[in-house]
Amino acid sequence: MIETDKLAAERIIAATPASSHEEVFERALRPRQLDDYVGQEKVRGQLEIFIEAAKRRREPLDHVLLFGPPGLGKTTLAHIIAREMGVNLRQTSGPVLERAGDLAALLTNLEANDVLFIDEIHRLSPVVEEILYPALEDYQIDIMIGEGPAARSVKLDLQPFTLVGATTRAGMLTNPLRDRFGIVARLEFYDADQLSRIVQRSASLLNAQIDPNGALEIAKRSRGTPRIANRLLRRVRDYAEVKADGQITAAIADAALAMLDVDPVGFDLMDRKLLEAILHKFDGGPVGIDNLAAAIGEERDTIEDVLEPYLIQQGFLQRTPRGRVATLLTYRHFGLAAPDAGSPVQSIWDTPDAQ
């Protein structure tokens, strides 16, 4: 069986960071203020108002929950919020905060109006989450000192602060935690024009020469995700410097991305393998997830969490009660004739009428 977690992490079009080295590149390319932030106009407009109002009142910004698919800029927005408010940012993640004391240590070291950013906040343990509730509401925490009969609860006052939580799984947040966020913002996938502007800005920061058509070609294959766009830009830049004169044109971008097995709609080998299995091995579906996993040699979780979301979001795949089904868009993409709509796929449980 293929090591799916490792394989998913190494995909050129994966929306999660591939390595700590890539995170360094991301930090260098991040916009530093809202005026430089491309896309998410509704969220950006709301934050501009809320931040300005909080600054005028000299109060901390209300607690902010950012949710949406990975790679859309949640961490970037957290850093921008802190910078626009003129305060410090402390960053951690849900899995790191294993004990109540871990969170208490962070909270007690915050200065007035600081921002505490918790990534993957849906993965907080229940014990840590309980400590967080009074901190969010009253800027106080209760900690236990001592053990056994001598143990006692001590209430500690905290400086006013802003919690910015980020998650790709908003549905996994408990209701009490979700209700404590005054500002809730969903980040959406970017369109090609927005991504093209991001690519051109990043190219300028990387001192890469790119024309608008080259930027658009990269943008169209970036699956609506800035992180993927910036990763593809770096690889296309490498190709342009070695195989051409360093100028990224549409033709150079197309050749570089073809070399990377990224097709015109942003599919890679794994996407195509899944869709072609449904088309050719299961006559377009429906096919159960376990049968599909066995057919392509991938884990069920990898299909559900890594491969399917983008294919469903773009209309290439449907989940039905009977299994996964390829759409007409998928048939067109692979240059195949779609089945007659009046000829439903027969299930193994269907029986012919008695003669």
From Swiss-Prot:
UniProt-annotated stretches for the region Head domain (RuvB-H):
264-355
Q: Where is this region: Small ATPAse domain (RuvB-S)?
A: 191-261
Q: Which Pfam families does the protein's record reference?
A: AAA_lid_4, RuvB_C, RuvB_N
Keywords attached to this Swiss-Prot or TrEMBL record, sorted alphabetically, are: ATP-binding, Cytoplasm, DNA damage, DNA recombination, DNA repair, DNA-binding, Hydrolase, Nucleotide-binding
Annotated positions binding ATP: L29, R30, G71, K74, T75, T76, E137, D138, Y139, R180, Y190, R227
Indicate where this protein resides in the cell.
Cytoplasm
Q: Which PANTHER family match?
A: HOLLIDAY JUNCTION BRANCH MIGRATION COMPLEX SUBUNIT RUVB, PTHR42848
Q: In the UniProt entry, what is the domain comment?
A: Has 3 domains, the large (RuvB-L) and small ATPase (RuvB-S) domains and the C-terminal head (RuvB-H) domain. The head domain binds DNA, while the ATPase domains jointly bind ATP, ADP or are empty depending on the state of the subunit in the translocation cycle. During a single DNA translocation step the structure of each domain remains the same, but their relative positions change.
Family as reported in the entry's similarity comment: Belongs to the RuvB family.
Kindly provide the name given to this protein in its UniProt entry: Holliday junction branch migration complex subunit RuvB
Look up and give the organism this protein is from: Burkholderia multivorans (strain ATCC 17616 / 249)
